[in-house]
């Protein structure tokens, strides 16, 4: 059993439990062999100790991850068995899952969503190049570090159990919300299966919701290969058509319509917001296969009495004799049939025209109030009111949130004819409200210049806190608030807060440890040993010979934590013999001093050097008198 605070596998100190899965628990620990470096330790639960399938799957994850070394894949450093418990030791990622990040920040800005999905694609490009298919890509299996780096993890079913899609309990391998249609049907997973899951993740990043949901896993799986993916633009009008097309192609029902590999998808997503793709039309695939198709109304001729399937040419090879013998009878039959067909057509035309007149007669309707609704909600309300959705306009608003409807034209409450067009105005938000960029890792001076240039934010709106850091160079931003992608009102009272690295901090050592003064050479060596590299020696004259060479001051003061590259000024005493005139004066003063005082002064001389340069003459005269 794993115990908090104990040493596991003779190496790892367990700090706390940080996660629980279906088969394993994850702990934060310290690697005592590597200077207490933080690690994540994944341990197979004790109830699976004798489960060969579970152990094989657990070991498969270790082997899969061990093959991959990539900045966007969680690294693995150790694997083994300890006291009958299988374990994997991985790098510790200080952050959250992508699912948690989506819940807090979605819908994400287009650029941020592209950045995240590109890092996932880059990771999977590496995995696929090694023949490894993840099979369970989902936001819960992607980590976002505190610095914003995305890392794919949990290769537990990679390349595993390809011959099986449903277990005895009707649960599918892979999370059903991100499961490709071929996996849902029980087929083997391919590179395109991972691409499908990445497309679903991109949908969720851009909209904040999953495209398919239901009451059961089977119901959701059916939707994956029966229903078209919902329109992203209806849910988030800020998404350009080219970017939505990336999702449409990645999540195509037919594997042949998807990207051939993740590199192709990366190339496409990289240009999806470029100006030359701004007029791109929506991507549509042919749905002829395995579906019933209704012919468009404009292709149907109600007066065409030709058979839908022509007779075979063999029928035309009948002899003239046979044709002649039946000609008269056929004419009579045809004339009767023609009369009947003509009457039917006439009735259909008259009845249809009457019905069309009744149906098409306009009625008066009121335009519904859709202010503050989402675009999709507004469209539904307008259609329900027997009206058509006209042009969707984008407009800034200081009162209506981004993505919500500001107004309609004609305005709500206006009475119009049914089937009239209604334009919708959607808020792009307040121009004073911006989406925060990611400044972590940037120099504070560069970040301040960007804020001023791009948003007009000056120093009065920014609070800086200096924080020591061994990881970030001095002057580099470690943490920011609001976080990347969050909203910030440039005209509001809230301030942007930056934690800025002051670099590695070293404490100035004491020059008189245990009450014993150090010479300047001893103290200089102590400073270098502490890591200081910029040491300035400042000698000061003294007539106190006992103080010669000893340090009596340092700047910055002892105990101050500073950057080891900062200048350290060491002040020490240098003995200078007094001048002859000074000696005469001192001798006169000495002769006036009583012998008892002289004796007392002489006997009180200590072994410690005096470092008070201002009293050097008095000390010197005392020494002269005693001699």
Curated annotation (Swiss-Prot):
It is an enzyme of class 2 (transferase). Coiled coil: none annotated. Residues 12-275 form the Protein kinase domain. It catalyses: L-seryl-[protein] + ATP = O-phospho-L-seryl-[protein] + ADP + H(+); L-threonyl-[protein] + ATP = O-phospho-L-threonyl-[protein] + ADP + H(+). Residues 304-331, 464-490, 577-627 are annotated as: Disordered. Residues 579-627 have a biased composition (Low complexity). InterPro entries: Kinase-like_dom_sf, PASTA_dom, Prot_kinase_dom, Protein_kinase_ATP_BS, Ser/Thr_kinase_AS. One of its GO terms (molecular function) is protein serine kinase activity. SMART domains: PASTA (SM00740), S_TKc (SM00220). Pfam families: PASTA (PF03793), Pkinase (PF00069). ATP binds at residues 18-26, 42. Belongs to the protein kinase superfamily. Ser/Thr protein kinase family. Its EC number is 2.7.11.1. Residues 307-324 have a biased composition (Basic and acidic residues). Transmembrane segments: none annotated. Residues 361-428, 430-502, 503-574 form the PASTA domain. The active site is at 136 (proton acceptor). This is Probable serine/threonine-protein kinase PknB.
